[in-house]
Amino acid sequence: MTDLSRARYAELFGPTTGDRIRLADTDLLIEITEDRGGGPGLAGDEAVFGGGKVLRESMGQGRATRAEGAPDTVITGVVVVDHWGIIKADVGIRGGRIVALGKAGNPDTMSGVHPDLVVGPSTEIIAGNGKILTAGGIDCHVHFICPQIMDEALGGGITTMIGGGTGPAEGSKATTVTPGSWHTARMLEALDGWPMNIALLGKGNTVSSESMWEQLRGGVSGFKLHEDWGSTPAAIDACLTVADAAGVQVALHSDTLNEAGFVEDTLAAIAGRAIHAYHTEGAGGGHAPDIITVAAHANVLPSSTNPTRPHTVNTLDEHLDMLMVCHHLSPKIPEDLAFAESRIRPSTIAAEDLLHDLGAISMIGSDSQAMGRIGEVVLRTWQTAHVMKRRRGFLAGDNGADNQRVQRYVAKYTICPAVAHGLEDEIGSVEVGKLADLVLWDPAFFGVRPHAVIKGGMIAWAAMGDANASIPTPQPVLPRPMFGAAPKAAAATSVHFVAPHALEDGLADRLDLSRRLVPVANVRSRGKADMPRNDAQPRIEVDPDTFTVRIDGDVWEEQPAAELPMAQRYFLF
């Protein structure tokens, strides 16, 4: 047999163990640590589709029927990037779920074929050779202001949304809340036909426990406490008391003006209970100037929103106007202007960069249309990783490649929000048994534009050329909805996450929904230690006069980035 050079092997079958791949135009490199397809040692047996290729009848394609276990789809020779590792494998999908990561093919003619990856006549092939596969992104901070956010999110690699809203109402523009069972029912119906998993948050700003139980029975997955509705210590305690009894998560936007108390009072009201702290840095809201200190606490699950990711020379200028609009403020009212200015602090925004790189802030969401951009969750995560690589070099354990850093950052918008909100049994990683919510990337466009977004095993969104062309690739190649985005298919491949009490109360019978209703897992005992690769608890101090931030005693100096990757090389605007 003719020997293949590593370069030639990569051209034919994709990279293999020991090969390194640059992510878009960043300084980040990944190195493949394992090739479950056999690599060069089994050259010629790779599962490759096409004319004159392996996956043909009685060659790489066997006789197994679907009833005998053949997968519905195999993604061939793809590099899987997940919090648990960076490997190459064939990925099998059956019934909308991941069934195996290994070697696909025909065991009658090939060695080492995984028993759940036996290619048969019923098997579709997606060529992943030379591409990267990640879990579908989870945006943990979504304002449901307009339905068009779905297209933008899918086009950015997001397949699950956690948040709330009812449309362009003032409450929804400012707060991620779907208040009350009537609004919740209508939103569950409205979102039924989109290729997107949904977890709605109800209003937690009340001391009425029955009001919250009513919302849980109505189909919310948890609660949101927002200062615009009054995040008082009494409301925080009441909401967490109900959440503890129901097993659901609470997301917190605390009191920027410190009217009802300071950060210490909020922490006292939380009383060591699990809570998801939104935009922990504070530009998006929260006790000024030291809300960022909550990221040091074991019971707090901290996240960022993407407008401050990463800290750049333009970050401060755009934030003031955004904030005035989002929170229904007037520049003509001095108190409103002071409120807005108190939230924008370059020192804490700069410290946010470092806390992400340390794994102390565990998640990144968008804050869509409410100071954040829903299509840029993935992109800004990797821009932050790039900026930190330039400033801090390799992380411990990395040498020549950035696997540790990449695994930390991919977890911020996949497994960490899934664990925080009790969704990890269904989504959040590329693992056997989970929904096949997957994003396929060309390495040159990693984090920028997906090659394809697979929702529950079906391609829902993809880069596609002119539909009147003779082949799929002529320009303009644009991200477009595919058959998996059609309403009935989308409902069959997506889920609504709801509180267990909603199912016990018969919500599925009360609403005419096409998709599955899935109960969230009990999250009340979860804390920072449960955030994969993002469980650090450094000491964080903020000077109340100068806003200087010390992390484990050291001042983190502001060095806003003047240039970023994944920007104007890819976008006109």
UniProtKB/Swiss-Prot annotation:
<dbReference type="InterPro" id="IPR006680">
    <property type="entry name" value="Amidohydro-rel"/>
</dbReference>
<keyword id="KW-0479">Metal-binding</keyword>
<dbReference type="GO" id="GO:0005737">
    <property type="term" value="C:cytoplasm"/>
</dbReference>
<feature type="binding site">
    <location>
        <position position="226"/>
    </location>
    <ligand>
        <name>substrate</name>
    </ligand>
</feature>
<comment type="pathway">
    <text>Nitrogen metabolism; urea degradation; CO(2) and NH(3) from urea (urease route): step 1/1.</text>
</comment>
<dbReference type="Pfam" id="PF00449">
    <property type="entry name" value="Urease_alpha"/>
</dbReference>
<keyword id="KW-0963">Cytoplasm</keyword>
<dbReference type="InterPro" id="IPR017951">
    <property type="entry name" value="Urease_asu_c"/>
</dbReference>
<feature type="binding site" description="via carbamate group">
    <location>
        <position position="224"/>
    </location>
    <ligand>
        <name>Ni(2+) 1</name>
    </ligand>
</feature>
<keyword id="KW-0378">Hydrolase</keyword>
<dbReference type="InterPro" id="IPR011059">
    <property type="entry name" value="Metal-dep_hydrolase_composite"/>
</dbReference>
<feature type="binding site" description="via carbamate group">
    <location>
        <position position="224"/>
    </location>
    <ligand>
        <name>Ni(2+) 2</name>
    </ligand>
</feature>
<dbReference type="GO" id="GO:0016151">
    <property type="term" value="F:nickel cation binding"/>
</dbReference>
<feature type="active site" description="Proton donor">
    <location>
        <position position="327"/>
    </location>
</feature>
<feature type="binding site">
    <location>
        <position position="279"/>
    </location>
    <ligand>
        <name>Ni(2+) 2</name>
    </ligand>
</feature>
<dbReference type="InterPro" id="IPR050112">
    <property type="entry name" value="Urease_alpha_subunit"/>
</dbReference>
<feature type="binding site">
    <location>
        <position position="143"/>
    </location>
    <ligand>
        <name>Ni(2+) 1</name>
    </ligand>
</feature>
<feature type="binding site">
    <location>
        <position position="367"/>
    </location>
    <ligand>
        <name>Ni(2+) 1</name>
    </ligand>
</feature>
<comment type="similarity">
    <text>Belongs to the metallo-dependent hydrolases superfamily. Urease alpha subunit family.</text>
</comment>
<dbReference type="InterPro" id="IPR032466">
    <property type="entry name" value="Metal_Hydrolase"/>
</dbReference>
<protein>
    <recommendedName>
        <fullName>Urease subunit alpha</fullName>
        <ecNumber>3.5.1.5</ecNumber>
    </recommendedName>
</protein>
<dbReference type="InterPro" id="IPR029754">
    <property type="entry name" value="Urease_Ni-bd"/>
</dbReference>
<feature type="binding site">
    <location>
        <position position="253"/>
    </location>
    <ligand>
        <name>Ni(2+) 2</name>
    </ligand>
</feature>
<dbReference type="Pfam" id="PF01979">
    <property type="entry name" value="Amidohydro_1"/>
</dbReference>
<dbReference type="InterPro" id="IPR017950">
    <property type="entry name" value="Urease_AS"/>
</dbReference>
<feature type="domain" description="Urease">
    <location>
        <begin position="136"/>
        <end position="573"/>
    </location>
</feature>
<feature type="modified residue" description="N6-carboxylysine">
    <location>
        <position position="224"/>
    </location>
</feature>
<feature type="binding site">
    <location>
        <position position="141"/>
    </location>
    <ligand>
        <name>Ni(2+) 1</name>
    </ligand>
</feature>
<dbReference type="GO" id="GO:0043419">
    <property type="term" value="P:urea catabolic process"/>
</dbReference>
<comment type="subunit">
    <text>Heterotrimer of UreA (gamma), UreB (beta) and UreC (alpha) subunits. Three heterotrimers associate to form the active enzyme.</text>
</comment>
<keyword id="KW-0533">Nickel</keyword>
<dbReference type="GO" id="GO:0009039">
    <property type="term" value="F:urease activity"/>
</dbReference>
<dbReference type="InterPro" id="IPR005848">
    <property type="entry name" value="Urease_asu"/>
</dbReference>
<dbReference type="InterPro" id="IPR011612">
    <property type="entry name" value="Urease_alpha_N_dom"/>
</dbReference>
